[in-house]
Structures are given as structure tokens and as C-alpha cells.
Regions:
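Active-site-proximal cap/loop segments of hydrolase catalytic domains
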Residues: 1-156
């Protein structure tokens, strides 16, 4: 509602808005891109996109995957990869040791989006965990994000 409101006020150009998040915010970014037309592109960093890979609960969901498979599937952006047609940049540390956000999460979402004809790019940051620390990787991440926004948002 906020995007539509500020667009109608002339404050922003809705066709040139992007969404970005890290960890749970990346999960939300992927869901927003799959289920809305509010954004031109997205950037998702170190997210959990397939909740079946976290089968013993997440956030406030305490039931296991085997107790509530429909919840896990419905909450997973991976389940909607065929609807992810807006450009999504996936960035992940290749040594992510957070049990909910192993690097496999981004690798599989990337393959699913590309396999369904979507626009996606996967960037793996060497030796980085869930949060990024190396100066070179941070600078590279910023360059990738800027390049992505220039290509899919500014150029619109």
C-alpha cells in the first residue's frame, strides 16, 4: 500500500522501485517479487527460500514439516519460482553456517528461477558466513548491487 500511495502522490516512480533484504528480509524479498507487482527488481542476500530445508520450525512456526507440509510449502518462495519473473539478484556467503540459510538455499532458488525462464544472478562470496566481513567481498557485493539496480531499475 505504501508504494502505491507514494506513487499516486508523485513522490516515487513505482516502475523504478526495488526491494532488498538480508536473511529473513531476503526471504521476504523473494516472496514480494513472486506475489506482487510493486517492484522492478529485487536483491536478496543470504536468505532461506525453501522452508522444507528447515523442517523443524522457523520464525513462530513450531510444527515440523511433517506436521504441516502445506505451511512450509506455502511460505517458501522456492514453491513459486515459476512466478518469479522480475529480476532477482541472489548474493550469499559460500561458507554460510547459519542452519536455516546454508548456501544451498540460494543455489537452488537460482536454478529454479532460471529453469522457469526468470531473470536471476547468483553471486557467491568466498569464505563468507551469514554476515559478510572481508573488505573485498563487501566492495564486490556493493558493486554487484549497484550494477543490478543500474540495469533493472535506473534504466527503466
Amino acid at each position: 500500500a505504501a508504494i502505491k500511495t507514494v506513487d499516486s502522490m508523485g513522490v516515487v516512480d513505482k516502475s523504478r522501485c526495488a526491494v532488498m533484504g538480508h536473511s529473513y528480509g531476503a526471504f521476504m524479498t523473494a516472496n514480494l517479487l513472486a506475489h506482487s507487482d510493486l517492484f522492478a527488481a529485487g536483491i536478496a542476500r543470504s536468505g532461506a527460500y525453501n522452508r522444507t530445508l528447515t523442517p523443524f520450525g522457523f520464525q513462530s512456526e513450531e510444527r515440523t514439516y511433517w506436521q504441516a507440509p502445506e505451511v512450509y510449502n506455502k511460505m517458501s518462495p522456492f514453491s513459486y519460482a515459476d512466478k518469479l519473473k522480475l529480476p532477482i539478484l541472489l548474493i550469499h556467503g559460500d561458507a554460510d553456517n547459519n542452519p536455516g540459510t546454508f548456501t544451498l538455499q540460494s543455489e537452488r532458488l537460482f536454478q529454479a528461477v532460471k529453469g522457469n525462464g526468470g531473470k536471476a544472478r547468483l553471486v557467491l562470496l568466498p569464505y563468507e558466513s551469514h554476515g559478510y566481513a572481508a573488505r573485498e567481498n563487501i566492495l564486490h557485493m556493493l558493486w554487484e548491487m549497484d550494477t543490478w539496480l543500474e540495469k533493472y531499475v535506473k534504466g527503466k
